């Protein structure tokens, strides 16, 4: 539906023509994967936050298929991925667009679960505090992966992309493609978006499995996370008093480890999924 509105290890050098490009788009297509359609309130919200050229939607099953279909319909030099379960804060556009540069291919808005799932926000806050006390970023509750639920992308940076039909990590695949084409993928330093849904733990098994296929997770790193889990849970309980946050952390990390372990055990099976590590 269209709603009109008034090799990874090395990057190619930045061309002279790229340096001369205007850094700030005047209007962008907004891509929304959705199975339920968009309310008029949500469309109005998008128009209040973004200089919209067109709002494009796709009801294709699976996030990867939906994003691939939408990318093929983009008419603008830049476009925004916005999921239908987020709310952009008033400074979203000024922050994201303000980070555009000639070598930037994507700017991801940092998001919060505070409005949608308090247990997730409580645990994230506790881990941020713990990492500060220990002076170790590895204690933060974050796997380094892209999120395209509120992201501005340079269309040229994803030229000829073919997103594999995977249930998770399609965001990371898109980021890798952008970086393979010689552009940087940035994340805003401050929260500019709110997730309005409850965190779904069911896909966490596939987060581990496909994260291993993509080369982002290893059994060793996930064993380390499991070893840290008792300390994380106890600190979270002491810091927030939220038992739900502690049980969430246990379920999530155990499921991710199980998925990673399964992928590790099957690594010699010749699964074509391992080709995902090389976009």
Regions found by a protein language model. Give the residues of each.
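Glycine-rich, basic loop-to-helix element that forms the pyrophosphate-binding segment
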Residues: 58-74
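Conserved donor NDP-sugar-binding/catalytic core segment of glycosyltransferases
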Residues: 91-122
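Short, flexible, basic/aromatic active-site loop/helix in glycosyltransferases
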Residues: 125-144
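Acidic donor-binding loop at a coil-to-helix junction in glycosyltransferase catalytic cores
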Residues: 148, 168-176
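Active-site donor/metal-binding and catalytic loop motifs
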Residues: 183-205
